[in-house]
Design a protein with these regions (language model features):
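Conserved acetyl-CoA-binding loop-helix of GNAT-fold acetyltransferases
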Residues: 86, 92-105
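Conserved active-site alpha-helix within GNAT-family acetyltransferase domains
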Residues: 97, 120-128
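Short amphipathic alpha-helix that is part of the acyltransferase structural core
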Residues: 1-33, 53
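Conserved acetyl-CoA binding element of GNAT-fold acetyltransferases
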Residues: 74-88, 115-117
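Conserved GNAT acetyl-CoA-binding A-motif
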Residues: 107-120
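Active-site rim helix/loop that mediates acceptor-substrate recognition in acyltransferases
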Residues: 28-53, 69-70
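Conserved beta-strand in the GNAT
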Residues: 51, 57-68, 80, 85
Length: 128
């Protein structure tokens, strides 16, 4: 696995066009409105969105829902890691691991347990 210097930080509005364009080029339906909604949820402290950049280029992201959508997690106040993506050209570089490490460290400040949702149908794409 090749490793690289990755900058991981919270999503801001300036990131949205580049993120939406990156997924549009892959043919994935992840419009700018999705990230604008995430930004609103982030401002309301419902979700944190961590974005990864390699040499200034968007490489991937992961979100933490502080009040899980999955009822068994929500009932026990377990934060949920959802919508975790690394662009294909940046896979096998440790970016996903670094995003997950960041999520785990943030969650550890409020919970000993983290939940994660996984898509298991072909339209979700490759697990990373």
């Amino acid at each position: 696995m090749k490793t690289c210097n990755v900058d991981i930080r919270l999503l801001d509005s300036n990131d949205i066009p580049e993120i939406a364009q990156a997924f549009r080029e892959l043919g994935w339906n992840k419009p700018a409105s999705q990230y604008a909604h995430y930004l609103v949820e982030q401002a309301l402290e419902l979700r944190d969105v961590y974005v990864a950049f390699v040499e200034g280029t968007f490489a991937g992201y992961l979100t933490i829902c502080w009040k899980a959508g999955y009822e068994p997690f929500r009932e026990k106040n377990i934060p949920e890691i959802v919508d975790f993506n690394v662009l294909p050209q940046f896979r096998r570089m440790g970016i996903g691991s670094q995003l997950m490490d960041k999520a785990e460290s943030e969650i550890a400040m409020v919970s000993r347990i983290a939940g994660i949702g996984m898509g298991v149908t072909a339209d979700y794409g490759a697990a990373q």
